[in-house]
Amino acid sequence: MRQRADVEVGPLKSGLLFSYMQNFCALQTRLRRPSRTTELDTMDFKPFLTLQHFRPQGFAGDVLAPGASYNQTWNTMASKFNGRGGNRVETGKVLEAASESLKETVPLLQLVVRARHHPLLVFLVGLFLGTIYLLYRYWDCAVGCERRPDLKGPKGLPLIGNLMWALKNRDPLSYQVYAQQKYGYGNTHTLPGLGRLIDISRPDWIEHVQKIKFSNYVKGEQFHDQMRDVLGDGIFTSDGERWKMQRKVASRIFTVSSFKAIITQTIREDCALVEQLIETYARQGTVFNLQELYFKFTLSSFVKIAFSQDIKSLSEPDRPDTFGDAFNYAQKVLDMRFVQPWWKIAERFNETGRKMRAARKIVEEFTTNIVEARRKESEAMGEKSKPESSRKDLLDLFMAYRSSDGQRLSNQQLKDTILNLMIAGRDTTAEALSWMSWHMLTKPDVYDRIRHEIDATLEEEGEQAGLEIDYDVFEQHTAKLTTFQETLRLHPSIPKNIRRALQDDVLPNGGPRVRKGDLMLYSDWAMGRNPDIWGPDACEFKPSRWTDQETGSSIKYSQFQAHFFNGGPRLCLGQKLASYEVVQLIHHIFAKFDLELIDLGPGRSAGFGKVPDYLNSLTHPMKRPLMVKATLRCCKEGTR
C-alpha cells in the first residue's frame, strides 16, 4: 500500500534522502569539470550508501514505492553521469571510495535500523547504559546525592548509600555516638529517598539551625508526607504560617492564670486517683507495670486539661487502652518509615500496613468523638458562648480561632491538632517519669535524697497539706527537679530529629558546607553522652551537676546544651506543665509508698543489671515493662 514518505520512512530516512539529493546534484556538477578526481575521493558518499540499508524504493513525487536494488540504482546513476560527456569516472573508483565510508557507517546504522523492529533491545541497551552512568555517578552514595569528599562518614554502597546499615542497625542512637567518635562532628550518611544526612549534634550548630538561621531549616515536605496519615498538619509536622498559627493559639493555655485555674487542680485530682490505685495494688500485693500507670495518668490529665473530658483511664484502669495501644503502634511505624524509602508500597501489602490501618482507624475514632461532641455542644448553645470568665480549654481556643478571611478550622484540622498535642502531653511526660523512677529505684543515693526532701515538706506543712505542691513554689523542690532534668539529659523524650536546608549554608566554627536539600540530623540522646559537652562523667547519672555545689543554687544551662525541651522559636510550650506534673506526682507516690523494682528476667521487664532498652519510636519509651511492687509507708521514718 502506498504511503506518504514522511510516514513510511520517518525522520531519519527523510533526512538521508534530502542529503542524497544534495550530493547527487553536486556529483553531477563536479563530473562535468576537468580534473576533479581528487574531489571525488574526498566526497561524502554516506547518504548514497545508507540507502542500501533501507528497503529499496522508487521515488515518485512525494510518495515512495518499491523500486530497484541498490546496485541497480548505483549503476544507473554512474551510467547517466558517464553519458553526459566531459571527464568520465570509473564506477570502480567510486565504489572503492564508497566502500571505505561504508565500513565506518554500516555497524551503527545497522543497529539503529534494526532497533526499530526490536523495542526490547532498545530498552535493554538503554537500561544497561543508564545503569553504567548511575553506578559511575553514585558509586559510593545514594541516588540523588552529590558526592562530598569533604565530609567524613562510612562509605556507602553504589546507588543505595548507607541503606543496608540503616536496615540492619537495631540501635540507631548508640550508633550515632559511635559514628561521632569515629568520624567526628559533621559525619554524613546517604539514604535513598531521604538524601544526605549531616550529623550536627553540637550546641553551636543546633543553635545556628534552630535559631540563627531558623527560616532556612524546616521539617520539610518529605517529613510531612511520612507523618501525614496520622499527624496530619499539626504543630509537630508543619512549618511556616501553619505552624505559627498553632503555636500562637496553643500558647494561650500555658499561662500562669491557666495553671492556677485549670492545670494545678486537674493534676492534683489525677494524682489522688493514682494514689488510690497504688494503694489497692499494695494491699493486694500485686506487681504492676509502673510505666503503663504513668501513661494512663498523663493521658487522663492532658485530655482533661486540653479537652475537658474524662476518659476514665484511672477511674476504670482495667478497661483496655485501645487508643493508647493504637497510638503507640502508629508512632513506631512512623519512625520506621525514615529508613524505608519503599514504605508506601510495602504497607499496601504487608502485615505492618494492615496493623497500621487498624491503628489509624482507632486513633481517628478517638479524635472524632472529641471534636464532634464539642461541635454538638457548641451548636446546642446556639448564639450563646462561654463567658470570658469561664474556663476555656485548648479545644475552645482552637475552635474560636478565625483566619484573616474569617474561616474557622475544619474538623480534620482540629483532629490533627489534638493528636499532635497528645504526643507532647501524654507520651513525653510518661516516658520521663518511667526513666526517672528506674534511676531512683536502682540508685539508693538518688532515692534517699528525694525521700528526704519529701519528708521535710510533710514535716513542715503537715501530712495532708504537704502532699499538695503549689505551682508558685514547685521549682523549690530541687531534689526532684534536678533528678528530672538529669533524666531528660540521658533519656530525652524526643531523642532524635531532623531539619532540611532550603538554601546552601555553612555551619559555624569550622563546620561543613550545607547544600540545598541536605538533612540536618541531631540527637539529644547522643549529646547527653558527649564528654565534650558534659565532661568526662557525661554517661553517669548525676543530678548534682544541676546544682552549684558552693552556693546550692540551680545551674541554668543553655537551651542548646540542655536541649531536651528543644530550642529557639520551637522551644517546648509545655515544659513548665511537664516539670510541675512530674514533681507533683513523684511527691505524691513516694510520700505514701515504698516501691521495689521487680526483675522478671531478661527480655521480660526492666531489670537492675543495665539501663533498660528503649523502643525505637518517635519518642523514647522503655522497650519492656517497668514492674514494681508497692508497700504502704507506716511512718516517715520508714525510709530505705
Swiss-Prot record:
It holds the Pfam family p450. Disruption phenotype: Results in complete loss of ustilagic acid production. Gene3D superfamilies: Cytochrome P450 (1.10.630.10). PROSITE patterns: CYTOCHROME_P450. One of its GO terms (biological process) is lipid metabolic process. Its main location: membrane. One of its GO terms (cellular component) is membrane. InterPro entries: Cyt_P450 (IPR001128), Cyt_P450_CS (IPR017972), Cyt_P450_E_grp-I (IPR002401), Cyt_P450_sf (IPR036396). Keywords: Glycoprotein, Heme, Iron, Membrane, Metal-binding, Monooxygenase, Oxidoreductase, Transmembrane, Transmembrane helix. Heme binds at C572. Induction: Expression is strongly induced under conditions of nitrogen starvation. Expression is positively regulated by the cluster-specific transcription factor rua1 that recognizes and binds to the specific 5'-T/G-G/T-C-G-C-A-T-A/T-C/T-C/T-G/A-3' upstream activating sequence found in all promoters of the UA biosynthesis genes. Pathway: Secondary metabolite biosynthesis. Its EC number is 1.-.-.-. It is an enzyme of class 1 (oxidoreductase). Belongs to the cytochrome P450 family. This is Cytochrome P450 monooxygenase cyp1. It comes from Mycosarcoma maydis (Corn smut fungus). The lineage of its organism: Eukaryota, Fungi, Dikarya, Basidiomycota, Ustilaginomycotina.
